[in-house]
Structure formats: structure tokens, C-alpha cells
Amino acid sequence: MVVVRELVKRFGDLEAVSGVNFSVAAGEAFGFLGPNGAGKSTTISILCTVLTPSGGSASVAGCDVVRDPLGVRRRIGLVFQDPTLDEYLTAEENLRFHAQLYRVPRAQVARRLDEVLEMVELSDRRCSLVRTFSGGMKRRLEIARGLMHSPQVLFLDEPTVGLDPQTRSHIWSYINELRARERITLFLTTHHMDEAENCDRIAIIDHGEIVATGSPEVLEAAVGKDRIELHVDDPTGAIAELRDRYDIVAKLSEGFVVFQVAGAEEFGPRLLAELHTATRSIRIARPTLDDVFMAYTGRTIRDAEASASDHMHAARARRGRR
């Protein structure tokens, strides 16, 4: 359904996407996981024909994104990262406008309106102005809009960005339901680990390159080590002691000393007894997708976001000096 080969996108000196390769099967939920600035939104913009690639090739639903962009657009739905609803129209008016743009047959519009509004539980608000909606309701309406023309592939670019945890959970309930009912292929980008767990397969992207691909279960099992987080009085000393005494590479992330080790339940008590710096707390967890990201990149996803931001600022500064 989606095939990408050696895809490249450059913005001046900045190579946002660096020769990525992947494919997505029909009916699959595929996730692009990575920090802000990793190349996720750039890739999805190319697949949706918003951007033209600098190199390589990509096809969606059998249509090449460069040679047949209109064919791609007819076959996809898109939920943008930023809100794009007209807040001075009602929910129904927004959907009808979208149906006109995609030339949905007039005889099908009323039925499809009922279906998508019921799916996202907004039937009772169809005549309400969008400006009266909460953030979660607007997101649900955007998902409904993306489904109005019955696309083969639905692209979701950071579908729950800016929403609180409870609303995020509700949005994912709707997404999982629509996948079951519509039998649609989903392609989503996210930097939330828990969202990626909803996918059949994920690709982890960092600095424009895919560093790992597989199901969440397979990727987590491949790490094979538990995660330990220490809150200590002297993080620098603890990191040095872990390196010199136990041959363990640890990182400082959000004030915690973080590292991976096999048999953490046995090693943890021993470490507390032997570590020279005072320990305020210790947390042991089974491998997560955050650990997978750290295993492949040497950083947590939050640290990677900070690095990506610095990288983009530096690139802009170089262009500004010319």
C-alpha cells in the first residue's frame, strides 16, 4: 500500500530525510516513531504530495507521489498536526465542504456524514459551530473529515498533539474502532511511546534515518535488558562509578541516571548497597519502546528532541550568515 525507496529530502544544507526505505501492507497500522525534528512530518508530507522529494521514490496505493500526485490525493485521507477546520462553520458544513472537494457522489454524502459522525460520537453536535468545540472534539471531527471520501490510506500526523492524557486515550479508542470498521491502512507519526504501542509495526527514525523497524513486541524483546532509573545526589559521580566499576554506560535524563542491565531485580539491591553516592530513589522497568530508542541511538527520545532543536537552530543560523 505504501512503498518507499531511498527517499531523500533536503532543505538547503539540512538533509531532513536521508535515504529511508520501508513499506506498509494493506490494512496495517504503521507508526513512525521519533523525536521532533527527526524527519517524521517531512516524510509524511512527501507521501501526501505536500512536498516533493529531493531523491528516491515513493508510491501510495499504487500511485507514484511525483508522477501521479492527484492519484495519491484521491486515495488518501490526512489528519494534519495543526488544526485546519473552519471554526465559523458547523461540523456538518466542514464535512460537506470536504466531500465537495473530493467529489463524493451527492447520493452518498448524507449517508457518509451519518456514518463518520456516529463513529466519532459527534452526531448530536453536527449543527454546532466548530469554535464551540473542545480540543478533543475538534480532533475527532478532523478524523471524521479524513474519512469522508472513504480513503484507502489514512495519514495521521501527531494525531493527539496538545491533548491531555485522558483525551489522548479517547482519541485512540476512536482510531482503533475506525480501523476495525473501515478496514483502512493507517500511517501515523508520533513521539509518544504509548501511541506507538497501538501499531502493528513501527519504524524508529532519528536524524532522518530509520534505525530500526519491527513490531513493538519484537523490538522490545530485542533489547533484552531491564531499565533502571536512579535519583542520586551526585549524578556525575554515579555515572562514572557505573562505568568504572560495573562497565555500564549510563546517561543523565531529566535529572535521573538511566541505564540498562540484565537481571535488574538482582542487580538493583546490590547497586544500592555498593554505590558511593546517596540514592534517593530507584525505579526498575521492563524494556519499553523508549529503551529501544535508547538502545539504537544512545539517547532517550526527550534528549533527542533537544538535540534536534539545536541542530535546526544551527542550520538556520548558517543560512542567515550567507
PLM region spans:
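Catalytic Walker B motif of ABC-type/P-loop ATPase nucleotide-binding domains
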Residues: L154-D157
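Conserved ABC ATPase "signature" region
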Residues: R96, Q100, A107-R125
